[in-house]
Each structure stands twice: as structure tokens, then as C-alpha cells.
């Protein structure tokens, strides 16, 4: 049994969740719409069409940090350009991927580019995706934990 999904206890306790149990955010900064100077990212947010993924949260965190720095220094907000990329290794030489690029437009996040691995891709394509997947994993790991 999977329990109902929602933002964590701390978000609810801080009063930034809405009736859905998630945190609505400003797509330009990931500042909560329900709490000034409260920035939320990742699975806790209402950030559709972005998926709830670690890579998406990583780019959201970078945007939030840049927005906080801009706020503290009196600078304009950075342009909200976010990405999600995910590779899955189905076999040793068989990879698949999904990617999306998102921008804040008209008060909402909009997917402006992206795609998935072609369903009928040949073995060479799948092998390349497996190689890209290994490089992607190394890059995101280094970005998060350092090299």
C-alpha cells in the first residue's frame, strides 16, 4: 500500500502547503507563494510539468540559490531556465533517456524542449545511451558530492 503523497512534515508545519498537500512556488525563483522568503524545491513543490526527480531538484536548487543571492544583493532575478535529464540502464549496453527544458513564462513553468529515447532505436543508439547514462551519473554525482 502506498500512502497518499504530499510534501514533508516541515513544509506543512511551516504553513506553506496548500489543500493538495504540496507547496505552490513562484516558478521564477521557487519561493513559496504561501511564505515570503521561504524557498522550496524538489518533490515538495507544485512545479508541473517538471517531474519529481533528483535531477530536477538539483536544477531547482541552483535557481533558488541564485534567486536568494539576487534578493540579498538587490539584483534582478536570474532567468529561470531549468532542466531534467534521466538515463536508465536497462542492460549493460542498453540505455534509455528522457529530458526536458523548462522556463518560467506567464507565471507558470513551461516545457520548451525535451524528448525521450526513440522506441524503435537500434542497438548502436541504445549502446550510446548507456554510455551517456554512465557519464550523466558521474556528472550529477560530482555536482552533488564533489569530485
Give names to the regions the model predicted.
Residues 20, 29-32, 53, 81, ...:
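Generic serine detector
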Residues 1-2, 35, 39, 63, ...:
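Broad hydrophobic/π-residue packing in well-ordered secondary structure
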Residues 98-147:
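C-terminal auxiliary extensions adjacent to catalytic cores
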Residues 12, 33, 42, 58, ...:
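Generic signature of intrinsically disordered, low-complexity segments enriched in small/polar residues
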Residues 1-62, 70:
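FAD-site-proximal beta/loop scaffold in flavoenzymes
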Residues 44-84, 88-90, 98-99:
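A conserved FAD-binding loop/helix module that cradles the flavin
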Residues 3-6, 86, 90-94:
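Glycine-rich beta-alpha junction loops
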Residues 21-39, 90-111:
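FAD-binding beta-loop-beta segment adjacent to the flavin cofactor pocket
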